[in-house]
Amino acid sequence: MSMTDNVADMLTRIRNAYKSKLINVSFPSSKIKTSILEVLQKEGYIKNYTSTPKDNISYTEVTLKYSANGDASICEIHRVSKPGKRVYSAIKDLKGYYNNMGIYILSTPYGVMSDREAHIKNVGGEVICKVF
């Protein structure tokens, strides 16, 4: 089976793992996925992630984060910019997602970063996904 949107597949696997109350989730690695996971870890949405080779393919295993009473740290995670319809935004057009309780993840000329970091660097770019 060929996949056209690997990032959407990763986000769906993470969303489904949280719904199933799993501790870990794994999927094939790529540079963009690793960059997105780095932002999610820096913002406190996941515990950690590791890349391991399996059968000549590198897989990433993500350890999900839950609160003390078992609530997921991610309520919603959705793809915004898709292969068929790219979404770009200037930094002045990005308002705080869920009253600044959530984040947008952007691909900018300076790398993949959250909207908060993009505001500090005053740079816009492609809106990859939104997380709350």
Curated annotation (Swiss-Prot):
PROSITE patterns linked to this entry: RIBOSOMAL_S8
GO biological process, one term: translation
Record key words, sorted: Ribonucleoprotein, Ribosomal protein, RNA-binding, rRNA-binding
Domain of life, per lineage: Bacteria
Gene Ontology MF: a single term: rRNA binding
Gene Ontology cellular-component terms listed: ribonucleoprotein complex; ribosome
Keyword Ligase among UniProt keywords: no
Function summary: One of the primary rRNA binding proteins, it binds directly to 16S rRNA central domain where it helps coordinate assembly of the platform of the 30S subunit.
The family this protein is said to belong to: Belongs to the universal ribosomal protein uS8 family.
HAMAP family per record: Ribosomal_uS8_B
Subunit structure comment from the entry: Part of the 30S ribosomal subunit. Contacts proteins S5 and S12.
Name under which the protein is recorded: Small ribosomal subunit protein uS8
Organism of provenance: Rickettsia bellii (strain OSU 85-389)
Gene name of the record: rpsH
